[in-house]
Amino acid sequence: MQNYNPNIDSFLKIYSQSLLSTGLTRGLDENTYIQTKLDKALKDDILNGLKKLIVLTGNAGDGKTAFIQLIEAGAEDRGAVFSSRTENGCKFTLNGFEFESLYDGSQDFEGKANDQLLKEFFKPFEGSKEPTAKIVKIIAINEGKLRDFILKKKEYNWLGKEVHHYLEYDNFELNNSLAFINLNNRSVVDIKEQDSIYDELLDVFLDKENKKQLWEPCKTENCSYANNCYIKYNVDTFRDDKKGEVVKNRLKEIILAVYLKKEKHITMRDIRSLISFIFFNKYTCNQLQNSIDNGENLLDRYYYNNTFNDIEQDRMVDILRQIDVADMPLPKLENHLYFQNPRTELEENIFIKGSLDANPDLNYLEEYYKNKPEGTSDNDEIKKESADAFLSSMKRKMFFEGNDDFLREQFDINHYSFLPYKYFERYNQFLRTGKDNNNQLRSDIVLAISKSEKIYNEIIGKENVCISSSSLKKSTTKAFYGFTAADFEIVLPDVGDQTKYIEYFPDHIIFRHVDKSASLEINIDLFEILMRIGEGYVPTSIEIRTFFLNLEMFKRRVLAKRSTKVFLTEDDSNLYLFEKSKSGKLVLSITQ
């Protein structure tokens, strides 16, 4: 059919706020399903009967049901005989093994109480030994429910010990017949890898090798709207041989920033939904063609504006809105952009050269540019809105498509300058390597914590975690307990052998005492605030309320340890040190 791509309708249904249907947001969608580590490491073991119990935990949308349904489909392909199929699981036999799946082990089903469902499901695991029966059970269940059900019942002696040790002890090795996978630890982005879940999903959407010919209907010979279509521009930009990889990696960095904020665990459902909206927005071929025919300015539907949409109710889009690259003040660049038509040769140099035949977004950008206020006395609100739309869109486009070499040469910035995180690269450097050369990062974190307690001597603040004493509040003298910096370390979280089954990239740094009695999780927002405090920044009351709760709890745990040092000062300049000597005597000295 001319001027119509049926694949777009399917992709639109993946978005959580789809106007067509949200039917493809749940369960197994074979068109966009990608093989993950879970499939590669576990599928054959399950179908060959090497695992007796597989437990999947995680959030809704993590792909638990899809994986179980894939196992069932694989079993059917191998000749399995199904005795039961319900909306909550199946029973079947394969090669002499009795299989049972349960999609949701945390809810009642068809009038049967949840505990009764679980009792029947876990029946073979009663007793004090590993079951000998040829069984394979696979269940998706809330971790809390698993704990409550198994650990509170005496009949699960053997399984109870395995569950308890798995939940309570780091790196506990389960019996070989068991596999427990927590999909909350799975990361959809990995800055170190080019085949992360994000990358694999993009490949499915883009069909760059034309194996499925998803975008054949969008060619100019098949669609008369091709040169004016934002969907074609969005897809072609990411498929472009010259700038596609750069744009893909910069979107990856934006999604990584959301991941590192830790406001929301990003599930498979979330990332599929987000990619769908960024590429396609919400409108069908017919609807977008009507908008083009009506002369609407459709700039807000281009991928770089979709990414930071300020209207949608999708949770991922809402978090992306918080890190909108258009909000970062870049005065020199903004002053330049404001007075330059987006079609000038100078503006073309700002962007990476691509091989696209059409750039319809420039028409909309130029329309906003020409409708800006004509001077400081022009108070026309519509013109002000045009100016805002023009500048915001140009900055977003520049983040994704900007030529870093040119930006660095002309404006002393690069695409990272658009992010609200000045220390984004440094944070990710440690996440990638886990290396802190010369303990420089540890020293900077220690200094920031000390400065947050209002101790301003940089040498003392770096060599000691300083925490103020509350006992001298009415005195002009300030006192600080000192804990030697060398007794602390920065490390990455360890998820043990879970990495056999899940894609993993750490989402935080851990700053802790070497004896592990006090530990602080540092996400990217807290890291940013701490680094700025180290430079002399004074956080706002809102920032303190938002980011400092965990920091305050950490300080209390540190204070529970015995300090051998107390620093005293009256003027923040001269510090006196009371320190317990090796002989047990208190020694007073003045610090430099």
Residue locations for each model-derived region?
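Conserved small helical "lid"/interfacial subdomain of P-loop NTPases
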Residues: 166-225
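Long C-terminal appendages of very large multidomain proteins
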Residues: 354-592
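N-terminal pre-Walker A segment at the start of P-loop NTPase domains
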Residues: 10-47, 113-114
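Post-Walker A helix-loop "phosphate-sensing" segment adjacent to the P-loop in P-loop NTPases
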Residues: 73-84
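Extended alpha-helical coiled-coil/bundle linker/stalk regions that scaffold oligomerization
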Residues: 206-469
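Conserved nucleotide-sensing/catalytic segment adjacent to the nucleotide-binding pocket
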Residues: 82, 87-139
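Walker A/P-loop nucleotide-binding motif
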Residues: 48-68
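Phosphate-binding P-loop
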Residues: 44-51, 129-130
